[in-house]
């Protein structure tokens, strides 16, 4: 059930630049290092308030690191409220033995 808001949602791209000095011409040159896309909360984009990811384990595992730790907000792009909901859902899934506590 996707809303039109999610379809119309566009990412903003921000470019980080590096300033270098060209000795031959005596001018400063600016070249882009990499393009960083602005992260957004995917749950806010579709207007989903309640997160119950226990039914969908593949979606739940997307928020885990390779060592089965919960990824922080700066990596997932979630807002504060939805990151807390994701963390609670992951902890519930760990308690129910759907997701491991630690990878070996």
Curated annotation (Swiss-Prot):
Highest taxon in the source lineage: Bacteria
Entry function: Binds as a heterodimer with protein bS6 to the central domain of the 16S rRNA, where it helps stabilize the platform of the 30S subunit.
Organism whose genome encodes this protein: Mycoplasma pneumoniae (strain ATCC 29342 / M129 / Subtype 1) (Mycoplasmoides pneumoniae)
GO biological process: translation
Family stated for the protein in its record: Belongs to the bacterial ribosomal protein bS18 family.
Gene Ontology MF terms in the entry: small ribosomal subunit rRNA binding; structural constituent of ribosome
NCBIfam families hit by this protein: S18
Assembly information from the UniProt record: Part of the 30S ribosomal subunit. Forms a tight heterodimer with protein bS6.
Protein name: Small ribosomal subunit protein bS18
Composition-biased stretches (Basic and acidic residues): 1-14
Region (Disordered): 1-25
HAMAP family tied to this protein: Ribosomal_bS18
Xref: InterPro entries: Ribosomal_bS18, Ribosomal_bS18_CS, Ribosomal_bS18_sf
Keywords: Ribonucleoprotein, Ribosomal protein, RNA-binding, rRNA-binding
Presence of keyword tRNA-binding: no
Any one annotated GO CC term: cytosolic small ribosomal subunit
Entry-linked Pfam families: Ribosomal_S18 (PF01084)
């Amino acid at each position: 059930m996707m809303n039109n808001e999610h379809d119309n949602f566009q990412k903003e791209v921000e470019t980080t630049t590096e300033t270098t000095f060209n000795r031959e011409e005596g001018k400063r040159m600016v070249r882009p290092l990499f393009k960083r896309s602005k992260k957004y909360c995917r749950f806010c984009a579709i207007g989903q308030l309640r997160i119950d990811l226990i039914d969908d384990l593949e979606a739940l595992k997307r928020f885990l690191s390779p060592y089965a730790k919960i990824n922080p907000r700066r990596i997932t792009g979630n807002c504060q409220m939805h990151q807390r909901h994701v963390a609670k859902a992951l902890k519930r899934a760990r308690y129910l033995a759907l997701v491991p506590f630690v990878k070996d």
